[in-house]
A protein has these predicted regions:
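FIC/Doc superfamily catalytic core
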Residues: 1-171, 175-239
């Protein structure tokens, strides 16, 4: 077990405030949901995490889904820490099920919580893999990825891009994919990273232009990794 995973699991167990686990939970949930349009602030996310309650802003309406998906993301993060084994469809679908539990999406008959999409969808103006082909394409992606003798940082980012291109779920693909990247970094002894507000536009551009220039998305993720390394150093994780 690598030092980062060991630290996260230990701090989770003892519920240590101000720790790597504590800060990662808040930072990861806030940023990953914010990218997808959540209106919660980082301070509100922290308050929800620390108190399991919510204080709203009179000037801004907050969706119940934003609150539930924030809480669900905390649970998703715990799930990946407790399931650092080879990546498979069951784990990916379970992350989606946890993330979308008790949301308005989960009340829709056509929205498959914890299963692949039934309706075609787009990323921007680009059509994704059709629902009838998702299962086949996901199996192919996982088989190719898991067959690698050694999985590198670049392999993890490449998997994420291909996962996003398939867009297997009706919604929640970005958050599930970023959770997968964090998990796979831990599993393969790579320092993980969180895509935050500072990196968001570069991240979008990297995804859009990945086929022509893989380096842009990889460099963006490496920059995000540098921020997590700084946090590790500030907390003296490797001392």
């Amino acid at each position: 077990m690598n030092k980062i995973l060991e630290t996260l699991l230990e701090e989770k167990k003892i519920k240590l405030k101000g720790s790597l686990y504590h800060l990662t939970q808040i930072n990861f949930s806030y940023n990953s949901n914010h990218i997808e349009g959540s209106r919660l602030t980082e301070e509100q996310t922290q308050y929800i995490y620390e108190t399991n309650s919510f204080i709203g802003d009179k000037e801004k309406v907050i969706s119940i889904d934003d609150i539930n998906e924030t809480i669900n993301h905390f649970k998703c993060f715990d799930y990946i820490l407790e399931n650092i084994y080879i990546l498979d469809e069951n784990l990916i679908k379970t992350l989606h099920k946890i993330l979308k539990n008790n949301t308005s999406d989960s009340q829709q008959e056509w929205f498959k919580v914890g299963d692949y999409k039934l309706k075609a969808n787009f990323i921007g103006n680009s059509k994704t893999i059709s629902p009838s082909n998702v299962s086949k394409e996901m199996k192919k992606l996982l088989d190719e990825y898991n067959s690698k003798a050694k999985i590198t940082f670049d392999d993890i980012v490449d998997f994420y891009y291909r996962f996003e291109a398939i867009h297997p779920f009706q919604d929640g693909n970005g958050r599930v994919g970023r959770l997968i990247m964090f998990k796979e970094c831990l599993r393969n002894d790579v320092v993980p990273f969180i895509i935050d507000e500072e990196h968001k536009l570069f991240y979008y551009r990297g995804l859009k232009n990945y086929k022509e220039d893989k380096a842009y998305l990889i460099e963006t993720c490496l920059s995000a990794q540098d921020k997590y390394i700084k946090l590790l150093n500030d907390l003296e994780i490797f001392k």
